[in-house]
Amino acid sequence: MVHHKVTIIGSGPAAHTAAIYLARAEIKPTLYEGMFANGVAAGGQLTTTTEIENFPGFPDGLTGSDLMERMKAQSVKFGTEVVTETVAKVDLSARPFKLWTEFNEDEEPTTTDAIILATGASAKRLGLPGEETYWQRGISACAVCDGAVPIFRNKPLAVVGGGDSACEEASFLTKYGSKVFMLVRKDHMRASTIMQRRVERNEKIEVLYNTAPVEAKGDGSLLDALRVRDTRTGEESDLPVNGLFYAIGHTPATQLVAGQVDLDESGYVKTVPGSTLTNVPGLFAAGDVQDSRYRQAVTSAGSGCMAALDAEKFLSELE
């Protein structure tokens, strides 16, 4: 039976930062990066980002794929074992924990003293016609990550959603766009009163109620319009915009541990405040799988560091 001291499940900034810290501490972690785990290539959601300008140390920016390749190279350099298999099942009922990879669920499990869960969260999409064509070519799920890139500057933009997050993203985008349309499917927002007032006072934001996007349009290279539908009359028209931002929530990749660890009402792993500890001793959660608020590459990396230090302390207390 194969046994690991620490197993990291994930392939984004949190996973590889945890691996770097553990490997440098000579703990020799094993990282399961997955084979299109949760529908995303190894490297996580960042691999779908064409340009990152807000990760410290890269004044000229770099692509999400480049950043993750560098992180992986660094974790491997210090001794991380990277396994390109997807963990399909875990048993957290007793230590050592047990895990099985995809297509090997009936085989003997691998055991591990500790697990760092860094499986991330995926942005909810609408599945519009044209969405795949213009994803990261005008369509994004993160205004803070992408709002400042050149294709959005001084251009009309749109935000889908009617909650606090949508209001926050619309307000943020007014720093860069010439105008921001909020597309709200119903005749009212569900955002808090204070956020609605903030939107109403911003001259660069126009709220389009009873409006739903039905198609992303462009020249095949960049988005330049949305086909929108009036949800009351069914009438459709084109809205000229160069950016579409989804603010309709994220889905944390917690199905692997559902029923075995405490999750919040949105499905994110609950951690002890100020740490990555969960209610299961030996299981640590890092990155977007436990962060419903910030969801940034740099905050994910920071929590990966925390998880490594928490895991190292846990292991030392076992000895």
From Swiss-Prot:
Native species of this protein? Eremothecium gossypii (strain ATCC 10895 / CBS 109.51 / FGSC 9923 / NRRL Y-1056)
**What does the annotation say about its assembly with partners?**
Homodimer.
List the EC numbers from the record.
Answer: 1.8.1.9
Q: What PROSITE patterns would the database entry show?
A: PYRIDINE_REDOX_2
Highest lineage ranks of the organism?
Eukaryota, Fungi, Dikarya, Ascomycota, Saccharomycotina
Cofactor binding mode and count: Binds 1 FAD per subunit.
Name by which UniProt lists this protein = Thioredoxin reductase
Recorded GO CC terms: cytosol
- Family designation: Belongs to the class-II pyridine nucleotide-disulfide oxidoreductase family.
> A Gene Ontology molecular-function term?
thioredoxin-disulfide reductase (NADPH) activity
Question: Which Pfam families would you find in this protein's record?
Answer: Pyr_redox_2
Q: Which UniProt keywords apply?
A: Cytoplasm, Disulfide bond, FAD, Flavoprotein, NADP, Oxidoreductase, Redox-active center
Query: Which cysteines in this chain are paired by disulphide bridges?
Result: 142-145
Q: Which reaction does it catalyse?
A: [thioredoxin]-dithiol + NADP(+) = [thioredoxin]-disulfide + NADPH + H(+)
Q: Which gene encodes it?
A: TRR1
Q: Where in the cell is it found?
A: Cytoplasm
Biological process GO terms, please? Answer: cell redox homeostasis; removal of superoxide radicals
User: Does the record bear Cytoplasm in its keywords?
Assistant: yes
At the top level, the lineage of the source is: Eukaryota
Matching InterPro entries = FAD/NAD-bd_sf, FAD/NAD-binding_dom, Ferredoxin-NADP_redctase_2, Pyr_nucl-diS_OxRdtase_2_AS, Thioredox_Rdtase
